[in-house]
Design a protein with these regions (language model features):
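Conserved AAA+ ATPase small/helical "lid" subdomain
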Residues: 164-213
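AAA+ P-loop NTPase catalytic core and its hallmark functional loops
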Residues: 1-180
């Protein structure tokens, strides 16, 4: 993942809820030490304002006020996390198509052919997370054209042993008994969630890391 990011490839981390997709991106961020911008596309209600910006008037003059996304994609070697892209509004997907296309790499400010275009700076890397699996329900299926603009990294929910190994690697100074307890409880909630309909939330890998830290 780090080598792909260094080459400017777009990465999509896919997997069921709780498997540590966002945390994996954060680890890549720490390793690369690049300017970072986080966007939760799953909670975005107004894609045009969030991704492009707004037209505003002042003393009879109309001007364009760019979004923070527009500003960040003009900074070389920035990393942009498009979190929960699978839950995003389809309009957000359409806006991002040219941004993520390696042969285009621009953001069109308006639908008009003559509208201004904002070029994506060199070295900008886009990462995204997408939920899949039986625990993910949505009326939307992620656009195939958008998905093809990413290199897909498939992730699975960690088992108890793998989670314990991860925690001991991240927290070598924490007592192993504590880390073992966290990994065991997390694994048990995930197992129970598969067979018990009353359990609708699991302890995610991110939450395990937070408890350990």
């Amino acid at each position: 993942a780090i080598r792909s990011a260094l080459r400017g490839k777009n990465l999509m981390f896919t997997g069921p809820s709780g498997c540590g997709k966002t945390m994996a991106v954060m680890e890549v961020r720490k390793a690369l030490k690049r300017p970072f911008h986080y966007m939760n596309l799953g909670s975005t209600q107004d894609p045009r304002t969030t991704l492009i910006g707004t037209r505003e008037a002042d003393d009879g003059t109309t001007y364009f006020k760019p979004s923070s996304f527009v500003n960040v994609i003009q900074n070389e070697n920035s990393m942009v996390l498009l979190d929960e892209i699978s839950r995003a509004h389809p309009e957000a997907w359409n806006i991002l198509l040219t941004v993520l296309d390696p042969k285009q790499r621009y953001l069109q400010v308006d639908e008009a052919m003559e509208a201004d275009k904002v070029s994506v700076a060199d070295g900008v890397c886009f990462m995204s997370t997408a939920n899949i699996g039986t625990d993910y329900t949505s009326a939307r299926t992620i656009d195939r054209a958008l998905e093809e603009r990413f290199t897909i990294i498939e992730m699975e929910v960690l088992g108890r042993d793998d989670e314990f190994d991860l925690l001991t690697t991240l927290f070598p100074n924490v007592e192993e008994e504590k880390l073992d307890t966290i990994a065991t409880i997390a694994a048990e909630t995930r197992r129970e969630a598969k067979i018990e309909s009353k359990i609708n939330r699991i302890i995610s890998t991110r939450q395990s890391v937070q408890m350990a830290g």
